[in-house]
Amino acid sequence: MVHPVQVGKRTRMSFSRLKEVGQMPNLIEVQLDSYDWFLKEGLQEVFDDINPIQDYTGNLNLEFVGYKLDLDSIKYSVEECKERDSTYAAPLKVKVRLLNKETGEIKEQEVFMGDFPLMTEQGTFIINGAERVIVSQLVRSPGVYYDMTVDKTGSKLFSATVIPNRGAWLEYETDSNNIIYVRIDKTRKLPITILARALGYGTDAEIIEFFGEDERLKATIEKDNTKTREEALLEIYKRLRPGEPPTVDSAESLIESLFFDAKRYDLSRVGRYKFNKKLAIHLRITNQIADQDIVNPQTGEILVQKGEKIDKDKAIEIQSCGINEVYIKIDDKSFKVIGNHFVDIHSLVSFDISDLNIKEYVFYPVLKEILDNYADEESIKEEIRKNIYRLIPKHIIREDIYATINYELALSYDIGYKDDIDHLGNRRLRSVGELLQNQFRIGLSRMERVVKERMTIQDQEVITPQALINIRPVAASIKEFFGSSQLSQFMDQTNPLSELTHKRRLSALGPGGLSRERAGFEVRDVHHSHYGRMCPIETPEGPNIGLINSLATFAKVNEYGFIETPYRRIDPKNKRATNDIVYMTADEEDLYVIARSDEPIDENGYFIDDKVTVRAKEEVLVVPVSEVEYMDISPRQLVSVATAMIPFLENDDASRALMGSNMQRQAVPLLKPQAPIVGTGIEYKAATDSGVLPKAKNAGTVVYVSADEIRVRRDSDGGIDKYKLLKFKRSNQGTCINQRPIVSKGEVVAKETLLADGPSTDLGEIALGKNILMGFITWEGYNYEDAMLISEQLVKEDVFTSIHIEEYEAEARDTKLGPEEITRDIPNVGEEALKDIDERGIIRIGAEVRSGDILVGKVTPKGETELTAEERLLRAIFGEKAREVRDTSLRVPHGEAGIIVDVKIFTRENGDELPPGVNKLVRCYIAQKRKISVGDKMAGRHGNKGVISRVLPEEDMPFLPDGRPLQICLNPLGVPSRMNIGQVLEVHLGLAASKLGWHIATPVFDGAIESDIVDCLRKAGYSEDGKTVLYDGRTGEPFDNRVTVGYMYILKLAHLVDDKIHARSTGPYSLVTQQPLGGKAQFGGQRFGEMEVWALEAYGAAHTLQEILTVKSDDVVGRVKTYEAIVKGENIPEPGVPESFKVLIKELQALCLDVKVLNDDNQEIKLKESVDEDADELEVNIEGTENQPEEKEEKEKEDSDEYDDLREEDVEPDLEELSLDDLDLDDFGDEH
């Protein structure tokens, strides 16, 4: 039943029936842990891989001994970096040792290897002053993958792919004649026996003896025209290096370097782990029948007798003895299973080796050699340490290849299984740490080449490590990654939820991933292994659907990069649900039968029913209690954070829930945040983990609180912790970041207590919108097609008012003609325009500005003209003052207005770092309060979005029997066809809760049910159907039917009409076609396209059509003359020749066609090449402001689009071709 729950400082009444087992992990630990691993281990791995660098003679030896990030010499703090457009980074210092083997001389030096970007506590990076997020990438895991197809005769054809982390691929395939082929590194196919011969089994007899008798193998041998190892080697060499003279030696070294050289072929830990999982012998012989006695080679003891079934434990024992070949019986045939000879080291070594940190299987022959030659614990450990790369090879080894061939043969006997590449056991996550590591590796290997070259050139006596190392390639590759990788994105900072979701995003795109065009339907689809790992709901609509996902709430990423989800263990003896929590990967989960989290159990954990609903792989079954092995931990473990914030999600259609999840990320922070009356209980966790709220670092007592600082006296040592609050800062998206204290003086705070609210949070809970009194009622057609009718009260009381801050910058550069100057002294500008400009030429803080107002006065020197004698005389007398300058001041762009809230000035003199050629940089911040207005887009949390169609006076809105007018009217027709019934339940519950004064938590899949809502309505004194009589505000008459009325949580989205509305009379024109530009950013016109021309033609509106195609567009002289005529009040002149006609003529001439324009008398009409002389006579500039909008604006625009789901760089729209309407993409094209 309903019970109170404390979340932060607020009590919510919860309808949850299940008690939560286990904590939700920190929501941004994906980012933090990964970067942490990189600094601790990842960097070291790269140095280990590249050590030592030797010159070509092998005499000089360069080694990286150790490294440290110098955290004490970080230049600027995070806030300063944002202000100064610099990168938040620490210098990486590496200790390098150079050994000269001839002289035995050793030189050690500490070498600076560039500034390394650091992750902030919030999991972001500050790169050039912009906050960026590195998105985790979902890629195919390295390993062996088998597939099966059925050909037209109905026979099964098996194929396989061996995928390394980097290096040559091996692909096996069977044709319909039962011949198995191999492709090495995507070349032409060869019979597989050629590969086996080249690796060491040269003759037919050796192959058959090793792999066993098999039809397909024999067919392949017949097809194979080589008979010895040498022939096979030469054949492979011819295929891989066509045109080079083949020799056996070069062929051998080619194969060695292709597969068995750790520098060229890398499986990585994950690959080795997946190989052993797939090829280890114990997994393949379990539950098979032995065809011969299996004998322990050390003791001679018979482990399994012929004809006996091999169970799991026996199989593991067989593997641990070092047995790698087992004959098993399949339908009266004997088949030989060959493993890859890897064993679990812990079963063979009697002492504790946990300090060696070996988690994978190890190669048995090497281990046996060590155990045979050494007896005592210390020396065995020492040898294992020395031979770790032989025990756990990073590259593929011959045994692996034999085992993969054997697996391919075994599949036709139904031993083994085929793989599903969309299964999350076969896809892994590359998080920040690994992406950085790969990038760093690229940089280091480039550097290695430079070092080797320098070693040969420089004098070996005086050489030092510092002189050898060039850090350029390393620094450049890191910089390139953060600045321009598809996975390094401009953080979506619209509100705390969008920040959090961005950090938890999983993308299948990017380098080494899929591309949008190639990704088929299967990759994008929801898969049963996504359960509890990836959200099935939250993904963008549009071309990226299913390629960009979100991590589920309880998911974690393990050391191999596989996503894990937690389950409760069921005690196998008495079948009781314990509180033991086990994190499992998708592979492990497939082995078990798992019950739902809301399966009824009593307080001791025993199941109430005899039969239980369970999941087993992709099936949902009902099984007896005795078969259940695990149980879900929480009903919301399968969805992401944004989706878990939708109340009554279980009553919404999936596609609408998807829109709801995506639109919450676009909610603009409002002036006064308000937590939802009907929440789901995850709001507090989401806000605290998003990193926008300051938390107490230590327990203590608050001693001072003001709007911008909080001080806490620590309990431990009586010292003072100071917390500076952010006031009215601009976010990446131009929304406002403002923190307000929520603790008071004298309050005792524990560690991690929230001290202040941030944007869109209320008492530490995420508060994206407002609770609004609404009714489902149509009103005079103003609700047509999802439009919304709102009351003027929302405007008057600033309910949906938000603050937006824009940044503009002006820089004074050195030009060829002299330096630009920031000054108040601007030519041809009256005193009126300068009233808010101070003596430096910069606007004062607090000034109110409109579009066209000067923000920063700036003049640029004009070109010197040849001076006449008189002018030279004047110059000589009066000095330089008469020098020509033109006005290039920074002005407020069209359609913008507001109040100056901050001005920042950077100059060379103050020692600020400025780009080359810039002497002074001024930034102005303009804040505007945007009230809700017609054309703004609003939405609920259930995908019910609409645009405001009319603001109605309060007195005209429909009102309740107690006289309260509604605040919003929504169309009832928006509900049934869309099947998002959750909104109706939310409205009913909101009505009851507001009357009872409750805040409610109704968790997803475990929330209030219909009977609960009815009880609440009854308790609040409303009728059970939640409907009430409404009266018309204009007449006072009641409406015919009773109406559903209640409180709904409504968000104002970032698609604001002020940013979209746009008008132009004259403005900039395109250079070649002379047509007006398109789009608001270019201050363009509306395109009058082909179809619109047809419409005017159909009307026969000849004159209108003529002027649209000429003077309103690209008749250069005509448009100036027309403008002049309008100004002077004369008649409009005849249109001239449109520029596009001249372009057409030129294009035809470019095709070598002699095209001329003739008049009636066949006289050629000369089209003027240039219209400049005409235009000059007219002395009218109709391009409005001569200069086009500042580049700054365009940069902003690019930035805001950058996070837009990894747009590929090359999809630049041709702005001239698009109309404004096209630019204003579909509401949710991607996730704008």
UniProtKB/Swiss-Prot annotation:
GO terms for biological process: DNA-templated transcription. Its EC number is 2.7.7.6. Residues 1189-1198 have a biased composition (Basic and acidic residues). It comes from the Bacteria. GO terms for cellular component: DNA-directed RNA polymerase complex. The keyword Nucleotidyltransferase applies. InterPro entries: DNA-dir_RNA_pol_bsu_ext_1_sf, DNA-dir_RNA_pol_bsu_external_1, DNA-dir_RNA_pol_su2, DNA-dir_RNAP_su2_dom, DNA-dir_RNAP_su2_hyb_sf, RNA_pol_bsu_bac, RNA_pol_bsu_CS, RNA_pol_bsu_protrusion. It catalyses: RNA(n) + a ribonucleoside 5'-triphosphate = RNA(n+1) + diphosphate. It is an enzyme of class 2 (transferase). The RNAP catalytic core consists of 2 alpha, 1 beta, 1 beta' and 1 omega subunit. When a sigma factor is associated with the core the holoenzyme is formed, which can initiate transcription. Residues 1171-1180, 1199-1232 have a biased composition (Acidic residues). The keyword NAD does not apply. DNA-dependent RNA polymerase catalyzes the transcription of DNA into RNA using the four ribonucleoside triphosphates as substrates. This is DNA-directed RNA polymerase subunit beta. It comes from Clostridium botulinum (strain Okra / Type B1).
